[in-house]
Amino acid sequence: MGWGAVVYEGGVVGASLVGLGWAGLWFLNRRLYKEYEERRALVQILFGLVFAFSCNLFQLVLFEILPVLSKHARFLNWHLDLFCLILLLVFVLPYYHCYLLLRNSGVRRERALLVAALFLLVFLYGFWRMGIHFPMPSPEKGFFTMPQLVSRIGVIGVSVMAVLSGFGAVNLPYSYLSLFIREIDEMDIKTLERQLMQSMETCIAKKKKIVLSKMEMERIQGSEEKLKARSFLKRIVGTVVRSVQEDQTEQDIKSLDAEVQALEELSKQLFLEIYELRQAKIAAAFSRTWRGHAQNLLGYALSVYCVYKMLKSLQSVVFKEAGSVDPVTMTITIFLRHFDIGIDVTLLSQYISLIFIGMLVVISVRGFLANVMKFFFAVSRVGSGSTTNVVLFLSEIMGMYFISSILLIRKSLANEYRVIITDVLGGDIQFDFYHRWFDAIFVASAFLSLLLISAQYTSRQTDKHPID
């Protein structure tokens, strides 16, 4: 292979990674971040890298099928991508996430670096011990090998993927169908906005009181010099009075600080609730447009697929079946059985199934992310810190999710492509285990999500009016 081909293939690989990384940053800043959230440069870079390497895995699958680039270039791209992605997931992200949590908690930089290094060692030990409880490749070649690391990441990733898919299978009809959309009264939003303004004004007033109390303490402490010029009895009386005043002022400041923190937390929750109500009002108006009606029809179609997937996964878990033909392949096969137009059923259904499943994956991840954001904002008192934690957590999930997707998609590919992916990931990996593991967790996640969303819908139904 000449230098021209090397430069061309290297340019294609580099340009695709740069493009995917830019797309990841655009998605993070335009879709996930909100206007009021602080953004850290290094966190965005890590997210962009994980996004690029993760999406490149799917791109490499397409490169194998089309094919694009030479066989040697694709092989090197596979190994480079997996090496960089595993390095980020197993070493860089856990270390930096722990370091950032410590720094946000006020720990000094040197101590945070040391504690994060100790945490990484504990994480690696737990990561290794996890393999004892699941089917893993032979450990003869060591722990830090591609099959060992991919297998352990696959267990976590398939679990996360099954939870997301189970949640998405239930949340998708709830989010897309106008049947579950409720009209938001503008007066409810105005009431919350008045409460927010009152909370912020009260918070500002109490902060002013804190400043005045601190100035009073400084005045009392400054009067100590004047007491020295007085008689002994007056100095004793003045010292006692000053001590009582300082104690009372300190108690007032502590009480005001606690009230300010509570008011800031209340203001943050009110702000998020107002934002969510505004979004729900926009969604209700959108559902009345022609695009909203089209989305409603799409929601019914995807809901049928979700119900089918839940039933087939339940059947697989109960009867321990290896899996059956997906509905897309079944529909195309029945159609072409009566109308033979010379199309390869397996290849066509493979592409359509991946597109259909991909839509469910994207929607479920976005829905799950929204709930993760709510959780972190509810339990954290530092808004920017919680946002950073969510992005790093999402980066970890995303990388494991995409590696696990390759483990599961491999079974849907033709034998010639399946062999290539098997060689790249490691021939000792127990691929069938991941399909059984996915079905079991998917069923549990779907039924649990059904219970939670039903409870949420029931609790809110009395406060909102259905759309005509």
Swiss-Prot record:
Chief location: membrane
Coiled-coil stretches noted in the UniProt entry, renumbered to this chain: 243-279
Cellular component terms per the entry's GO annotation: endoplasmic reticulum membrane; plasma membrane
Membrane topology: Multi-pass membrane protein
InterPro entries the record matches: ABA_GPCR_dom, Golgi_pH-regulator_cons_dom, GPHR/GTG
Pfam families recorded: ABA_GPCR (PF12430), GPHR_N (PF12537)
Keyword Heme on entry: no
GO biological process: cellular response to cold; response to abscisic acid
Subcellular location: Cell membrane; Endoplasmic reticulum membrane
Keyword Membrane carried by entry: yes
Transmembrane segments: 7-27, 45-65, 82-102, 112-132, 153-173, 297-319, 345-365, 389-409, 437-457
Molecular functions per Gene Ontology: abscisic acid binding; GTPase binding
Covalent lipid adducts (N-myristoyl glycine), residues: 2
Key words of the record: Cell membrane, Coiled coil, Endoplasmic reticulum, Lipoprotein, Membrane, Myristate, Stress response, Transmembrane, Transmembrane helix
Lineage: superkingdom: Eukaryota
Subunit note: Interacts with GPA1/RGA1.
Family: Belongs to the Golgi pH regulator (TC 1.A.38) family.
Entry function: Involved in chilling tolerance.
Protein name (record): GPCR-type G protein COLD1
Species per Swiss-Prot/TrEMBL record: Oryza sativa subsp. indica (Rice)
